[in-house]
Amino acid sequence: MDVRLTSEQRQLRDAAAKLAGELGPGSVLDLADARRRIRLEDAVAGTGFRELRSDGASGVEVAIVAEEFARGLVDVPFLGPVLADDLQGRLDGDTARWTVAHRGVAIDASGCDRVLKLEDSGVFAGPVGDEVAGADLTRAAGAAAGPWEPRADISARHRDRWPALALTTTCADLVGAARGAQRLAVEYAKVRSQYGNTIGSYQAIGHLLAESEALIEGSISVLWHAAWAVDELEPEQALRAARIAKIYAARAARTVCETAIQVHGGIGNTWECLAHVYLRRVLVSTELFPVRLEEAGLGLS
């Protein structure tokens, strides 16, 4: 495994980061800005990021975009559509907007009208129902109750590999959200003064942020191994790598987000502080394709 990104992958990362930085929400108030979201939706649709897999992109490329979008709190669909694209590809003449279902819910479903679910016997399609209330302020969910109809044949190998991609993509979302929350906390610690000094100069705050940074670096390591494994290892090995990454990244991201709230002090518990938006996204991404320790062979024997 070569951990270095290629020049094309670095360009992809920079493009995704620029898009998220320019059009993503910079404040909680921006989440209600419909015109901004329309511009963001048009920009994401124009990039073709949602069709990465049918364009031949690897799991690494999908993870790159997912991570940068989560870091910038991009609040238009990516996760659901890119996973749906991997299941069925780009069909000629199909104008529907697709996402995927998990436990009876169409995830990341804003603007989507059709949903796919993967079963042992194949891929099935159904309508996206009414919006389902959720904690995530950046992604909507819809009901996925059917009726279902067979949509596409899928090989056993692809069927076994897709869960690894789904886990890895949600893991990338967790890592990106953790990075965003950490950036928010560090920037605040640099400017918030107490007792004549910025709070970041005090060991109590500095050590908290250093621990968060270490957790993020560990998450990045397991994420990139899992993303590489999606296409390079056998499905069973790829799935195990993805499960391990998801377990580690989920716990790390929650800790990082909670630390970011703590660093902000009283303002961290207010609606206006973006820290809770990152935490909400992390909590929801953790429950998308969740993993137990026993499934990764990490439980107590």
Tell me what each language-model feature is:
Residues 13, 169-232:
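Extended amphipathic alpha-helical segments enriched in small hydrophobics
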Residues 19, 171, 185, 212, ...:
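Amphipathic alpha-helices that form helix-helix packing interfaces
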Residues 1-72, 300-301:
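Amphipathic, small/basic residue-rich leader segments at the start of a protein or domain
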Residues 5-8, 12, 33-36, 198, ...:
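Residue-level recognition of alpha-helical structural elements
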